[in-house]
Amino acid sequence: MGKLIRRTSLTSKIINLPIDYFIYVCEQFDSVEWDKVSDRYSIPFSLAVNFIFLLMRIYIKSTHVPVQRNQLFVDKQSINTSRSWFRAFLSFLSICFLFISFLNFIFSTRFQNKLYRTLPQDKRTTTSTPNVKPVFQHSNNDDGDEQVFELKVWSPNQFLLNFACLFSPAHALILWFYSTSLRVTLLTFLLSFTTLHFVNKFSLLLKDQQYLHRQVFFEYDKKFVEPRLSVVKRDVAINTTRGPTTASIEYFTPRKPIDTFLEHRSSSHDHLTSTPRTPIALQRRSVHHLHDSGISRDSSSPFKRFPHLSDGSSRF
């Protein structure tokens, strides 16, 4: 008898269609390399949206003819001269563009954040940023003097950030009300490009600072860390199986120790409620534990020839 496969019913497919489509859109959104796309298409796309929105508003306003009701009242009344479906469609499309502008601004400024957690430190530690907040934790052996802090860092998408600069809500509202004024339109575009220029310069400043910090850490590792940790050592084996008078000493080729790491877990950090149990620090393994250092069988080491020396008692 063949394998029975339970197929999804048509009702379940119809019910799950919206959430499945939403998950598919989210996966496609995450699969896009936005760093490459933003450098090439963000500014042309934003300018195209501005141009289309401006043309729609000009067409909608040009279909209104202001006339005066009489000589007594100077109020003006707009009479629609074109009630076609095309004008209604353009009005709906311009409202959608305005809604997208507000939605993009709110999403790129409020919901694009990354969370980082610090090691347990003193509760009285003062922070220089308001984005650092203490994290509630459950710990059986909590001494009450240490606290884990969480840092929320703004990490905007570059494509959405450029789009927010060139098609911000203020920019869209100005084009909505003053689309027929050439002077106001040019000043609006000038202001948007000025904002984009400052944002790009500030992003470049952050990249330069990150590069400078990496170079400082690299220089520190090269000058202080590596010379003290990666010290060249040699293995020495002493054979005393025939007595102390006939002991022999064998020297091996000097080499650097193999770096291995151990997971170090903090008791207060393991009991956090919002994250699973993950290692928060790595501790360098002592070079005396040679039986765990992963020495290959063909390496120049005495433990390949003398297995009883694997306890590390004869290492010098």
Curated annotation (Swiss-Prot):
Membrane topology: Multi-pass membrane protein
Highest taxon of the lineage: Eukaryota
Segments passing through the bilayer: 41-61, 88-108, 159-179, 186-206
One GO CC term, this protein: chromosome, centromeric core domain
Keywords, ordered alphabetically: Endoplasmic reticulum, Meiosis, Membrane, Transmembrane, Transmembrane helix
Keyword Membrane: yes
Region described as Disordered: 291-316
Function text: Has a role in meiosis.
The protein, known as: Meiotically up-regulated gene 154 protein
Native source species: Schizosaccharomyces pombe (strain 972 / ATCC 24843) (Fission yeast)
Organism placement in taxonomy: Eukaryota, Fungi, Dikarya, Ascomycota, Taphrinomycotina
Gene: mug154
